[in-house]
């Protein structure tokens, strides 16, 4: 049978958040929760952010100075490469023009918020003006809500977080051409 459509997945996502909160789990990031104070998850935040992240093991991904890389996913091929003294790297991608800005934006949306003014303090780009039409649309659609000088992603916005982030980066890329 076919999987659930986007609307049903959104409803399931919202229900999962309610269930986790009702069970007193603490939200660590867009996709990670903790039950006790000893539980941590820094990987996704740092791997998607501006920090270099060294990846080890089959299927792991990392970044160094903006260059992304993926370790071979096939365990047998990975073992053979390591045994032969070779790096088991499956692919490497060069950083795009706005990789730093993209990573800074990812750091925000990974933690369920958007703060164009904070990005403007880091980079000489008028993010607030550039993204104004999208932000106004998302406010009207209920995907984000004002939170002081920044915007908080609503549950619906959290569901669409990856696409919202990509849309903002697409606007940045198209405006710089």
What is each of the regions a protein language model found here?
Residues 156-177:
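Short, amphipathic alpha-helical interaction segments positioned at domain boundaries
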